[in-house]
Amino acid sequence: MESTARKERVRYVFVGRVQNRGVRFACVTCARKEGLTGWVRNERNGTVTAEVQGSSTGQLAFLRRLSTLVPGFGDNWSVGSEKPVSLVDDERDFGVRRY
């Protein structure tokens, strides 16, 4: 169903205690579980950025799953910003990038 749904791509910036807590691994796990593509990386300023591409339903499920998989959502870490960005053609997987 993901292939027929209208795709969107969103850049999320996660803030708070997000590095060295498994956030990148959790993003990969959640995105793949929802059939989403994109990437995630640690930033030098201590945040974690992810670009996630797929249906709006998949995006919501990704965030919901992520908030339960990484302890402390709302108290120790949160979504600092989310911004629509351009779609990436022919992207097939979700992975970790380096800055």
Where do the language-model regions lie?
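Intrinsically disordered, low-complexity, mixed-charge
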Residues: 1-99
